[in-house]
Amino acid sequence: MGSEMCIRDRSTHARSVLPAGSLLVANEVIRNRSQVLAENLTKWGHSGVVVTNNDPADFSSLTDFFDVILTDVPCSGEGMFRKDPVAVSEWSGENVEICWQRQRRIVTDIWPCLKSGGILIYSTCTYNTKENEENIRWIRDEFGAEVLPLEISTDWNITGNLLSGEDFPAYRFLPHRTKGEGFFLAVLRKPGVSDGNTWAGQVKSWEKGRKPQGKGAKTPGVSKEQLSALHEWFAVPDNYEFIVNGNNVSAFPKAYLSELSALRSSLRIVQAGVDVAELKGKDWMPAHGLAMSIALNPDAFAHEEIGREQAISYLRKEAVVLSETAPRGIVLLTYKQIPLGFVKNIGNRANNLYPQEWRIRSGYLPEGVLELATITG
């Protein structure tokens, strides 16, 4: 099983391409952006995800933890010049220097987390060699890393290393040659061979002093019978540990519980696994994250297929009127058989349970309808 750390924007794509048996840890330094990151990953629907809100230095205690680290490091943003005039006005040689130093600090902080033989993917959205090739040379020389070549097609029009006197592989996506804005990446391997989960001892020593969570935890207000009722909402409930926090329940893959414990020892966890439900009175109110999750048992709830206009109204958190034949109680709304979220149908109206902070605010809507041929987990 592998553990991957991804910083910021590449997280949903990373989760899509990671092999089975992988855990993604997605970190965002800025707190309000970490909430947006959690929202995006919730909508993506995979349970093998932990979202954190930490400075890279906070990861230093997780020695030899990650198999792969993808760093989308803060940069001077020269690749944004074409579409963002503000990026041009904010650029300066001094800012390049600040970014260059920050990038090296980030790599220094997270390098101990990478397992021996692990992979570091370094990326920026800027052009200058100081923040790109010069930093790759520095990582190579400072940490003994091997810069790895990638298999690419000449049809992609990727530009290589631009640093004079160096020929290590690097990849530039320049906007006049490739589709998209400016982008740089290089891939490096940490020297050595991993000898397994060397962080396991750290977990055991920390767990001695922590309060129990999940199985065996104190769960005031939630009985075992109430908790077991939630198992029916999952396609394969035995794969998950149901974790109670007050009246809220989340589910996390059992295969990654040791990793979660290690992360909790050092980091601020914004979200882990799937938000399942909140106990209100004697009834469970399903969380929106459950509707989005590929772990959902689709037969656990009554369904109501709705049209495009109703779907937009729902996502704007407006009132939704269901058909007279729609069942009462909690109903899972679908559009083209894809789950949108829950409502509570009380007959004369359906209470919209879509998260208030996620609602569509823009008045613009695309004219066409997006067709999704298949959705895979």
Regions picked out by a protein language model, each given a short descriptive name:
Residues 66, 119-122, 127-250, 255:
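Class I S-adenosyl-L-methionine
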Residues 23-28:
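Conserved SAM-binding motif I beta-strand of class I
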Residues 29-64:
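S-adenosyl-L-methionine
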Residues 191-377:
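Polybasic, low-complexity RNA-engagement segments
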Residues 32, 67-108, 125-132, 157:
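Mobile active-site "lid"/loop adjacent to the S-adenosyl-L-methionine
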Residues 1-7:
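Short, small-residue-biased leader/transition segments that mark boundaries at the very start
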Residues 8-19:
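Conserved SAM-binding loop of SAM-dependent methyltransferases across substrates and taxa
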Residues 19, 114-116:
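Helix-to-beta-strand junctions that scaffold the AdoMet/dcAdoMet cofactor pocket
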